[in-house]
Structures are given as C-alpha cells and as structure tokens.
C-alpha cells in the first residue's frame, strides 16, 4: 500500500536558477509540486515543497532521495519529509 509524503527543501543563498535545478532533480526522482485539491482540481505547491506517493512507509527513505536531489544544486540545504496518511488541501490559485 502506498504512503503519501510531503517534503520541504530550503536552499540557502539560492537563486531562482538553483530552484529550477532542484525542481528538475526532484521531478526526475518522482516528486511533484502538483497536488490534488479538495475541489478535485490540481494545485501547485509553493516553491521547494513537494508531494510523492510511494510504497514505502519510512519518511527517512524519502528524505534521503530529496537530499540527493538538493545536493545536485551545490547549495547548502535543509530538507524535511513527513508521511501523512490523512490530509486535505484547499490551495487558492495565485497565492
């Protein structure tokens, strides 16, 4: 059974290009900034925040994958991942 994870990556002293690189690295590893909203539409999470669904239960395993992606930016970084089995979202477009 799949688990749902949210991961937040903060790049220190980063440029917009650093976050674009991070986005590409996270995408390549199966992470997405797009998440289903309660209204059935899909919404984009803020920069540096990602969603992933995987058949593992250990947030540390997901966090390690995100750290590998962040390492590719060559910036110092902070990464936190958590598993959530129940969640809801109401992300307003444009915010």
PLM feature spans:
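Short, surface-exposed ligand-recognition loops at beta-strand->loop->(often short) alpha-helix junctions
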Residues: 9-17
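Short, intrinsically disordered low-complexity segments
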Residues: 32-75
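A structural signal for short, well-ordered beta-strand segments
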Residues: 7-9, 50
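Short, flexible N-terminal segments of the mature chain
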Residues: 19-38
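A structural detector for beta-sheet-dominated domains
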Residues: 12, 53, 82-83
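Short structural boundary motif marking the start of a folded domain
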Residues: 1-5
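C-terminal structural segments of small proteins and small subunits
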Residues: 67-93
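Alpha-helix N-cap/helix-initiation sites
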Residues: 16-19, 59
């Amino acid at each position: 059974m799949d688990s749902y994870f949210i991961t937040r990556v903060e790049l220190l002293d980063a440029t917009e290009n650093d976050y674009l690189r991070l986005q590409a690295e996270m995408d390549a590893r199966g992470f997405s900034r797009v998440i289903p909203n309660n209204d059935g539409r899909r919404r984009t999470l803020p920069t540096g925040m990602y969603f992933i669904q995987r058949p593992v239960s250990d947030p540390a395993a997901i966090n390690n994958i995100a750290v590998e992606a962040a390492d590719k930016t060559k910036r110092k970084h902070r990464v936190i991942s958590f598993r959530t089995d129940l969640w809801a979202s109401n992300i307003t477009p444009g915010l």
